[in-house]
Amino acid sequence: IIMEDAAKARFQSLAFRAVDAATAFDDLPDLYQQMGQALDTHTEKGDFQSVGDLLDDYIRHLNEKPQYIRTGLSKLDENLHLVPGNYFVIGGRPSAGKTALSLQLAAGMAKQGKRVCYFSLETDPATLEARLIANQLYAPLSAVKNKTLSMNELDRLADMKRWPLYIRSAAGKGVAWIKAQALRMKADILFVDYLQLIHERGSSDRYNAITEISIALHELAQTTGILVVALAQLNRNAARAEPSNSDLRESGQIEQDADAILLLSADGDTYFSRLTKNKEGRVGNAGLEFDKTLQRFTCAVT
């Protein structure tokens, strides 16, 4: 009862702030998020668990097959064991295939019945939809843009209408707003394209701003259980050599926070993919090939 009274008091305080004329409009998503947390009095996960209890739990579920979130690319899934609450970063220079890969992964996860929210801070939803159509139909992006698809190809798009995949523009928005929208949509997975474009007020220093954004995305994943997939730009010198985690633009915090990092690079028409951080599996060549015409990644034949 005491905990419930405290939660109500906290909720009322936040509600008064929300209707206060002095409260900035951009602060409302963060207040909305805090109000939801205030009413949830049963999410505390900080209590101790003995190793014996943890061992019993492990043995009890020994015969259950792990339920990882699949990407749809078998070579990636062999090593990238994504679970709810992970923070997965896909880094690359412009035109290395970051957006194409993220859309393909989002579609693959939606096909599994996962509710996926895709937040784009750079590209409008209609342009992303064109890339997604090309990817799913194995059709040239030019045919999609010029609207020269056959009726047979158009008929094959019917399944896409049933996917729980939602795309929206997030230009100029911050992490609190993204979190509030994802919670409103009951998302299992959210994509952000891309991290360095997220707007956070209050920090004039770019390094500190990106550091705070990465920390906030990591906390979002951990506190909500949503799988967060964030695209990230690489520094310009990454174009001249095989990229590494240190090339993640403007902050080393991204490397610190991420559960896994996949870096994409290109040399002319040849594309490379490498897992450079992976808490739950091996690192190294991810074994992916990119067809820019079809906007589609496939597993390399070995």
Model-inferred region functions:
Residues 45-139, 176:
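The Walker A/P-loop phosphate-binding site
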Residues 1-60:
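Short, small/acidic-rich helices and loops at N termini and domain boundaries
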Residues 88-90, 117-119, 168, 229, ...:
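Hydrophobic/aromatic beta-strand patches that form the interior of the parallel beta-sheet core
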Residues 8, 70-73, 126, 151-154, ...:
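Amphipathic alpha-helical transducer elements in NTP-driven molecular machines
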Residues 89, 189-191:
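Structural motif
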Residues 79, 95, 149, 212-302:
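Phosphate-binding/switch region of NTP-binding enzymes
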Residues 194:
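Walker B catalytic acidic pair
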Residues 77, 108-186, 200-201, 286-292, ...:
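Cytosolic-facing regulatory segments adjacent to core modules
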